[in-house]
Amino acid sequence: DDLSDFNPKV
C-alpha cells in the first residue's frame, strides 16, 4: 500500500 510510506509497518 502507498499508505505504508505514511504508516511504515515495522
UniProtKB/Swiss-Prot annotation:
> Which cysteines bridge via disulfide bonds?
none
Q: In which tissues is it expressed?
A: Expressed by the venom gland.
Location of the protein in the cell: Secreted
Keywords (alphabetical) are:
Secreted
Q: Name one GO cellular component term.
A: extracellular region
Additional observations: Negative results: does not show activity on voltage-gated sodium channels, potassium channels, and calcium channels. All the following channels have been tested at 10 uM: Kv1.1/KCNA1, Kv1.2/KCNA2, Kv1.3/KCNA3, Kv1.4/KCNA4, Kv1.5/KCNA5, Kv1.6/KCNA6, Kv2.1/KCNB1, Kv3.1/KCNC1, Kv4.2/KCND2, Kv4.3/KCND3, Shaker IR, and Kv11.1/KCNH2/ERG1, as well as Nav1.2/SCN2A, Nav1.4/SCN4A, Nav1.5/SCN5A, Nav1.6/SCN8A, Nav1.8/SCN10A, and DmNav1, and the nicotinic acetylcholine receptor alpha-7 (CHRNA7).
The family note in this entry says:
Belongs to the SA81-like family.
Q: What is this protein called?
A: Venom peptide Sh41
